[in-house]
């Protein structure tokens, strides 16, 4: 499993009305912050791909916002104070370990639509109560356990085959501490 890196916008109660509306709409009252790869809720802080990025990013359809070179990424975001520096693994086959390039803490698993929109089935689809309960999500909106995340991924696909947001990739998410 290869780690990828991304820096996303923080989404917290400090976002005022946007946060309040999101909590009201989603019903995720346990959240103290949302950490997700959902591009509508937690967009990347480097939305434009510069020419010098190409040697340092994932060169795959819909994945060019992810970096493979942690040090290069950190140089690009050095001047940004409020940010989530994330290490992620797409479709891990077991619980991954973050590389020692920074002090990363494991936050949990997200499930994002496989093709194109990067919408989280956990936090941006108004829930799938027949598959998982909102109360299963952590204070940052993620599933804690690998086995449960795989089960939710499998059940979303089998119980909602017509729903594009239910065809998901599983993402393990770690956040850098102290950066």
Please provide the spans of the model-predicted regions.
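Short aromatic-glycine-(Arg/Gly/Cys) micro-motifs in beta-strand/loop hairpins
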Residues: 1-60, 91-137, 166-174
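Short, mixed-charge low-complexity intrinsically disordered segments
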Residues: 39-96, 138-142, 148-179
């Amino acid at each position: 499993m290869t780690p990828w890196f991304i820096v996303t916008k923080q989404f917290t109660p400090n976002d005022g009305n946007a946060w309040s509306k999101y909590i009201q709409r989603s019903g995720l009252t346990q959240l103290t912050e949302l950490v997700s790869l959902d591009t509508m809720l937690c967009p990347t802080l480097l939305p434009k791909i510069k020419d010098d990025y190409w040697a340092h990013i994932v060169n795959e359809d819909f994945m060019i916002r992810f970096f493979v070179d942690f040090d290069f990424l950190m140089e690009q975001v050095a001047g940004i104070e409020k940010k989530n520096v994330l290490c992620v693994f797409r479709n891990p086959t077991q619980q991954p370990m973050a590389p020692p390039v920074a002090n990363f803490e494991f936050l949990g698993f997200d499930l994002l639509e496989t093709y194109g929109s990067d919408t989280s089935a956990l936090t941006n689809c108004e829930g799938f109560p027949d598959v998982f309960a909102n109360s299963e999500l952590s204070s940052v909106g993620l599933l804690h356990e690998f086995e449960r995340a795989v089960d939710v991924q499998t059940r979303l696909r089998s119980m909602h085959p017509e729903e594009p947001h239910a065809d998901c990739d599983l993402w393990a998410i770690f956040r850098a501490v102290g950066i």
